[in-house]
């Protein structure tokens, strides 16, 4: 039986010891899949002692059903349910703390409360609080009628539950949850932000609401992370800011990542990937080499944890971990 910690404890312990550890992010299985693929992804890296593992939360998507008469119906279906369940399965199997993601989109405050109760019962004492993206049938993000519009509201709800306060206010409480709350930060500014300064003020609101640490969106230029941390500190944000890295694995990333995440691809990395042509193996090597370079510089700067975005493909993370950690 492993000792239950929370992510903030883990980050602070690494800081106190002067070491850098790594964490990574997995997707829950597609509906109909079992746990094998997720466990294999963890098996690839477990020997390098990950600090913790994140598991993403996915909204519903549109699915078409064709009737016998040829007419089509569209339904909202979650293709990747099971975030809480697979998080508990990983934590129980490996004794590594797991951080389920929880989003605002598509959920009422009561849905969120029920999910948090399940997490608490299962020994999941960490959560990453996110607004989430627009639903498949939405042009822009629309909150549930009984839900939250912004991540800061979700943070407030989780922090309130830690104090024994529930949505309906009618519970005779004798047990308080103790979630460590993470939130997202954007070194290159959230797409919906009015300005970089406003974006940092929104982050400060999340911290003041109860967030314990920040995980950044992916970046490929460490200078942008260091500048972001400086600006956050100047704004009075003192919690740990964990850098997020993603190894490039496809030439398409040169186009899709900036378009989707407003992420800058440095010219040196772009040239290295373009020089690989359509050779997928060479592209992966270039992505690994760049991530190793980034991780070594971040480690030298004393960051306590580096978070890797993986899409559940962890073979390259194992190679990076072997080289850096």
Could you say what each language-model-derived stretch is?
Residues 4, 132, 145-176, 183-192, ...:
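Active-site pocket-lining/capping segments in soluble small-molecule metabolic enzymes
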Residues 25, 53, 119, 206, ...:
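Conserved, mostly hydrophobic/aromatic
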Residues 29, 48-81, 135-146, 211-228, ...:
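Glycine-rich, proline-tolerant flexible connector loops at the mouths of alpha/beta enzymes
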Residues 1-24, 31, 166-179, 325:
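N-terminal amphipathic alpha-helix/helix-capping segment at the start of soluble metabolic enzymes
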Residues 21-39, 97-110, 180-198, 274-289:
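Active-site mouth loops of central-metabolism enzymes
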Residues 108-121, 198-202, 227-230, 250-256, ...:
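Catalytic cores of alpha/beta
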Residues 109-157:
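Flexible, glycine-rich active-site loops centered on histidine and acidic residues
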């Amino acid at each position: 039986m492993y000792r239950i910690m929370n992510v903030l404890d883990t980050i602070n312990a690494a800081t106190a010891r002067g070491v850098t550890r790594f964490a990574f992010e997995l997707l829950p299985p597609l509906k109909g899949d079992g746990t094998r693929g997720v466990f294999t992804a963890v098996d690839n890296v477990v020997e390098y002692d990950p600090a913790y593992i994140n598991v993403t939360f996915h909204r519903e998507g549109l699915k078409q059903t064709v009737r016998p008469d040829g007419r089509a119906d569209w339904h909202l279906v979650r293709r990747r349910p099971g975030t809480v369940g697979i998080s508990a399965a990983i934590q129980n199997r490996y004794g590594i703390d797991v951080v389920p993601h929880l989003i605002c989109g598509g959920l009422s405050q009561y849905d969120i409360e029920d999910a948090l109760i399940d997490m608490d019962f299962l020994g999941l004492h960490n959560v990453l609080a996110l607004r989430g993206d627009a639903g498949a049938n939405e042009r822009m993000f629309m909150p549930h009628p009984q839900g939250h519009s912004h991540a800061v509201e979700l943070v407030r709800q989780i922090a309130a539950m830690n104090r024994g306060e529930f949505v309906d206010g009618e519970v005779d409480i004798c047990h308080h949850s103790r979630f460590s709350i993470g939130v997202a930060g954007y070194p290159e500014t959230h797409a919906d932000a009015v300005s970089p300064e406003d974006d940092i003020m929104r982050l400060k609101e999340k911290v003041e609401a109860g967030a314990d640490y920040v995980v950044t969106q992916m970046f490929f230029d460490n200078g942008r992370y260091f500048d972001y941390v400086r600006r956050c500190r100047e704004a009075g944000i003192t919690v740990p800011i964990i850098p997020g890295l993603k190894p490039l694995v496809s030439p398409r990333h040169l186009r899709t990542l900036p378009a989707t995440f407003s992420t800058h691809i440095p010219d040196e990395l772009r040239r290295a990937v373009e020089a690989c042509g359509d050779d997928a193996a060479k592209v992966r090597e270039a992505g690994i080499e760049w991530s190793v370079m980034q991780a070594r510089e971040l480690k030298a700067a004393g960051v306590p944890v580096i978070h890797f975005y993986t899409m559940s493909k962890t073979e390259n993370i194992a190679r990076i971990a072997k080289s850096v950690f």
